[in-house]
Amino acid sequence: MTRTLPPGLTATAVVAASSANLGPGFDSMGLAIGLYDEIVVETTESGLVVEVEGEGSGQVPLDGSHLVVRAIERGLRETGVSAPGLIVRCRNDIPHSRGLGSSAAAVVGGLAAANGLAAQTDSTLMSPERLVQVSSEFEGHPDNAAAAVLGGAVVAWTAAGAGDPRYAAAPIRLHPDIAIFAAVPQVRSSTAETRVLLPEHVRHTDARFNLSRAALLVVALTERPDLLMEATEDVLHQPQRAAAMPASAEYLAMLRRCGVPAVLSGAGPAVLALSTETELPAEALRYGADHGFAVKRMSVGHGVSWTSGVAVRT
């Protein structure tokens, strides 16, 4: 039985950006980054109001097709509650269409906000495992979604078998000596646009290469960061996407020539560097600035959080 929420309940969710793939871990590895979106939702008697500040303002829909709204509605169904009306306020710091998991953050944040509303009843809330499953259903793959839910670095997978896909993830401990740098350009790209550049089939030798590097990447991230250069090598998706984002491909190559383990962040065009140095080489910083990249050291992102309460009117 579905319970109708009364007007005046509020919930706030805070969700991190994320970087998927990390080189060889295509669709299976992710890392939460300390850049956050905030979603504030309030139940009302009727209607829908969507407000967006920051990234995406004036560009994303302000109706029921908004990804956050769709995720909230799915989350309410998951927890057995409904809301006659909603006010949804999104404060976005995660850049859109740059490969930093903005869509996963929208979905995970919306689901967490729904948990925050449902927590004010005796409903059963979505567990972290369920949040990974439902958010990955939106995304179609669990790497960004799992990182946004759990925080830190994750290995994610899709269980084999008949029926609907079952998604799961496990956190891995990131070595404390690893520093994270994000280089974000002004240009945009979509995962859908760059995914079509990938071949339907790959050579056995290429598959073997990436399997070895993905396995090595877990070792490098957790115990042996000195192996990150070799561990972040990839032949399955980054070379194929290079023509669609030449500036990012050149910056990635330039960083690696400087000895910096660098990868495309997700489908790009942002570039992620994982280094044991506290600063990038001066040459790399100059190149980034000259070619329109905003380069910044980032912290490791925490898992999605939510709070709930009652709206106060003044």
From Swiss-Prot:
The keyword Zinc does not apply. Its main location: cytoplasm. Keywords: Amino-acid biosynthesis, ATP-binding, Cytoplasm, Kinase, Nucleotide-binding, Threonine biosynthesis, Transferase. GO terms for molecular function: ATP binding; homoserine kinase activity. SUPFAM superfamilies: GHMP Kinase, C-terminal domain, Ribosomal protein S5 domain 2-like. One of its GO terms (cellular component) is cytoplasm. InterPro entries: GHMP_kinase_C_dom, GHMP_kinase_C_sf, GHMP_kinase_N_dom, GHMP_knse_ATP-bd_CS, Homoserine_kinase, Ribosomal_Su5_D2-typ_SF, Ribsml_uS5_D2-typ_fold_subgr. It catalyses: L-homoserine + ATP = O-phospho-L-homoserine + ADP + H(+). It is found in: Cytoplasm. HAMAP family: Homoser_kinase. This is Homoserine kinase.
